[in-house]
From Swiss-Prot:
Part of the 30S ribosomal subunit. Interacts with proteins S7 and S18. Binds to IF-3. Keywords: Ribonucleoprotein, Ribosomal protein, RNA-binding, rRNA-binding. It comes from the Bacteria. This is Small ribosomal subunit protein uS11. The keyword Transcription does not apply. HAMAP family: Ribosomal_uS11. Belongs to the universal ribosomal protein uS11 family. NCBIfam families: PRK05309.1, uS11_bact. InterPro entries: Ribosomal_uS11, Ribosomal_uS11_bac-type, Ribosomal_uS11_CS, Ribosomal_uS11_sf. Pfam families: Ribosomal_S11 (PF00411).
Length: 129
């Protein structure tokens, strides 16, 4: 007996005008999550999800492509204005922000929410190249 083809449920369109874009730029990858004001995820994307592998994930171009993808998905739900929260030391911080602005979003505020330890965990050893 043949299996029934699975029905793919289409995402219902939420009419959310403003939200928060969380840009997490690590040394290895850049992740962009767009949420509503309460913190519920509307769309997300990352450099790895866009098909970049290895050291290419950490490039500014990969962050730009990921931000464009997350922005396009959020715009489908009617989002127009964004607050941007940037965290992490990675190279994709500025390019992700510029890509969101170029995608047609009005950026109302930019906040750096990078956590700084009050002398917490011991850091990684220094690289010797």
């Amino acid at each position: 007996m043949a299996k029934e083809p699975q029905r793919v449920r289409r995402r219902e369109r939420k009419n959310i005008v403003s939200g928060v874009a969380h840009v997490n730029a690590s040394f290895n990858n850049t992740m962009i999550t767009i949420t509503d004001a309460q913190g519920n995820t509307i769309s997300w994307s990352s450099a790895g999800a866009m098909g970049f592998k290895g050291s290419r994930k950490s490039t500014p171009y990969a962050a730009q492509v990921a931000a464009e993808d997350a922005g396009r998905k959020a715009a489908e739900h009617g989002m127009r204005t964004l607050e941007v929260e940037v965290s992490g030391p990675g190279s994709g911080r500025e390019s992700a922000l510029r890509a969101l602005q170029a995608a047609g979003f009005t950026v109302t505020s930019i906040r750096d929410v990078t956590s700084i330890p009050h002398n917490g965990c011991r850091p990684r050893k220094r690289r010797r190249v």
